[in-house]
């Protein structure tokens, strides 16, 4: 994914920059909602102020990413047409360094809301100095996972207000966001932070998960084909949908495979789709490969598991 490489160059101030602005803002009519009432837990050093950058590869539409996020927020997009009662929290990818807010965020929300699904776009913390998760003094707990746990609980807390069925709240993520899907789907019995309000009394277990070209699934292990211990799959892990291309140059397809086998061993319902070609970081944007039809597969799967009407 050339855009990710370029994004890292921007974060570390090496290479050209296109249309850089101070911070990301959603489209008119939508408002970012801070997910923490005050300072986020486990706040640590950041590389600098939040910055939003728009880049474009020749022949491709532009993509916007945000880096150095230290103040996480969510943006709620209401369903269009008939409300199915389902909600999806979307985690953009970007290697835990940046977040591709349109390619793997707002464009996904446009699709979900067109299907009658409430979309909650999470701008989770990517301070710009650490990957997720790693050993050492900082972060003591993975800040992105804290943000994900908090947001799932918030959606459940506001379910009646937002027209959401509290038993139909899922998560969907790309690349590093796909790893975050796996992390929050397997780390829900205990929050990694002290409760701050009534929303933290709600369950932070998603009812389903969709991980698209996930990465980081084999970190923190010395074996060649072993699941990251920070993704402790059990029979209580929610149903999962996995999709990846075998020619993915950023996150090898074994990231999906190792998670798939762990889910199967635990007896968790899982559907996986692998494609010979497709690369990495395509989001919903059309390509010349069959993998571009993945939204229809996810929609069918959601109907199959009873999250949206058949």
Predicted ranges, named:
Residues 36-38, 74-83, 162, 230-234:
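Short beta-strand-to-loop junctions in surface cap/lid or active-site-entrance loops
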Residues 84-93:
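Short beta-strand element of the alpha/beta-hydrolase
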Residues 92-97, 246:
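Active-site glycine-rich loops that stabilize anionic/oxyanionic intermediates
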Residues 100-101, 107-108, 122-165, 286-291:
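Catalytic nucleophile-loop/oxyanion-hole region of alpha/beta-hydrolase
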Residues 146-235:
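Primarily recognizes the serine-hydrolase "nucleophile elbow" in alpha/beta-hydrolase
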Residues 242-244, 248:
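Short beta-strand/loop motif that positions the catalytic acidic residue
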Residues 249-255:
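Conserved alpha/beta-hydrolase "acid-adjacent" motif
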Residues 257-310:
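C-terminal catalytic histidine-bearing segment of alpha/beta-hydrolase fold enzymes
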């Amino acid at each position: 994914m050339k855009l990710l490489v370029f994004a890292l160059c921007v974060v570390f101030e090496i290479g050209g920059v296109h249309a850089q602005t101070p911070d990301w803002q959603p489209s008119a009519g939508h408002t970012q909602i801070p997910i923490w009432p005050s300072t986020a837990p486990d706040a640590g050093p950041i590389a600098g102020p939040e910055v939003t950058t728009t880049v474009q590869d020749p022949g491709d539409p532009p993509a916007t990413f945000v880096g150095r996020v230290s103040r996480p927020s969510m943006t709620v997009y209401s369903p269009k047409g008939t409300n199915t009662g389902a909600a999806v929290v979307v985690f953009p990818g970007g290697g835990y360094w940046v977040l591709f807010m349109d390619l793997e965020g707002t464009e996904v929300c446009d699709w979900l809301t067109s299907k009658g699904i409430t979309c909650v776009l999470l701008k989770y913390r990517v301070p710009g100095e650490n990957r997720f998760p790693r050993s050492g003094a900082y972060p003591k707990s993975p800040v992105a996972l804290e943000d994900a746990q908090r947001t799932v609980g918030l959606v459940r807390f506001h379910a009646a207000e937002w027209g959401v069925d509290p038993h139909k709240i899922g998560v969907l993520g790309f690349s590093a966001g796909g790893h975050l899907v796996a992390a929050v789907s397997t780390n829900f019995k205990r929050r990694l932070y002290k409760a701050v309000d009534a929303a933290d009394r709600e369950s932070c277990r998603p009812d389903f998960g969709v991980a698209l070209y996930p990465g980081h699934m084999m970190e923190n292990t010395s074996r060649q084909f072993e699941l990251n211990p920070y993704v402790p799959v059990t029979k209580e892990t929610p149903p999962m949908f996995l999709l990846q291309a075998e020619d993915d140059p950023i996150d090898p397809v074994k990231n999906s495979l190792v998670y798939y086998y762990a889910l199967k061993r635990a007896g968790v319902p899982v559907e996986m789709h692998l494609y010979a070609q497709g690369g990495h970081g395509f989001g919903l944007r059309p390509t010349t490969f069959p993998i571009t039809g993945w939204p229809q597969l996810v929609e069918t799967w959601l109907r199959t598991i009873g999250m949206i009407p058949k």
